Curated annotation (Swiss-Prot):
Principal location class: membrane
Database matches in Gene3D superfamilies: 3.40.50.2300
Organism name: Pyrococcus horikoshii (strain ATCC 700860 / DSM 12428 / JCM 9974 / NBRC 100139 / OT-3)
Keywords recorded for this protein, A-Z: Acetylation, Cell membrane, Lipoprotein, Membrane, Signal
Presence of keyword Ion transport: no
Protein's name in the database: Uncharacterized lipoprotein PH1714
Cellular-component GO terms for this entry: plasma membrane
Signal peptide extent: 1-20
N-acetylcysteine: residues bearing it: C21
Protein family according to the UniProt entry: Belongs to the BMP lipoprotein family.
UniProt-listed CDD domains: PBP1_PrnA-like (cd06354)
Amino acid sequence: MKAKLALSIIGLVLASLVAGCIGGGTQTQTQTQGKSIKVAILFDVGGRGDLSFNDMAYLGAERAKKELGVKIEYMTPKSKEDMVPLLEQLAKSKEYDLLVLVGFLWTTPLNEVADKYPDQKFALIDSTTGKVRPNEVDILFREQEVAALMGVIASGMAYELGGDTIGAVAGMDIPPLWKFHIGYLFGAKYFEKKTGKHVKLLWQYTGTFGDTQVGYNTAMQLLQQGAKVLYGLAGLTHVGMFDAVKDWNEQGRGKALAMGQDASQEWYAPKYIPISGAKRVDVAVYDAIKMVVDGTWKGGIITLGLKENGVGYWDLDGVKQFAEFAKEAGKLKDMTPDEVVEIVKQQREKYIKPYVWEIVNELAEKIKNGEIVFKTPKSHDEYEQIINELEKGNLNAALKKGSVE
């Protein structure tokens, strides 16, 4: 299947995101270059099947295999304790031109291994070791930017559902999730400031990215506390959140909606998931591989946000493409991709009103133009301080540059 994925606000994005990573030449020439390149994709402990982060990485690698002709192998450690031995084993083998490490949990293992094998190239996706090495590329995302937009959208939908409370089912208490938390709360308070409508956020860490039952139970608790919209930030775990929202509605316990993240997840329950945030893990993986194929590899840290088309939210073209992918994989059984799109379109029109889109677009422009730049907390204490200030309505506490009056 073609990975023709679309982002709202930013438009259709299939080209590379990382400046300088894409070299010239025809696809045939690139495929010839890539035939001798061997890459290992190392998922985090959640592995494939999360319909989100790891599956997006898989899509990027499969695109590289098809377009660049590289050989790809996939591996998932059984536990965090297995990560260093696995990484050491692969680096020592000298069998792979590139080891792509998917997710924050690989940060410490990479720091332990990278200097021992200076000739082995590593790409760390969604984290950084904090060290600049010639054999290491770290690709980060400015999660605050997508989460801020989703916070505005969630707040607007909550009011359409007759409430003022939004929630989030998050995975582990780690830096990428800190940024999501800051952005989501910022978006809610930005909505509050623009409309005068109070918004309450219920944020819950589950401690796992791979347990749907935990996601279900956590979501039910948040719904019982009054949350009208839940944002899934826990990989496979938040698939359980989707099930909880579906049951909540269909059992007549109240009205609630869910929002996905990373991949377009609307197809899973389009009546109850009108929108998903986008985090282009797929393109980050693809571009890391292409740097090796093209011979343009340069160690360092790359950060992607709205301006670089690295984050956003999925438009209806993206919804359809992922619904088609789900259909081909046998996961979408009860409707066609076109039916998914039609339901999502109707739900967006019903629950995301024009005034909300105006606020979203205004905020997105400020972010893309650099008028607003979010802080990235360097410690858990700083993260907590920012959250505490945001809860008081001090939006500027989250900003490195710019202000909200």
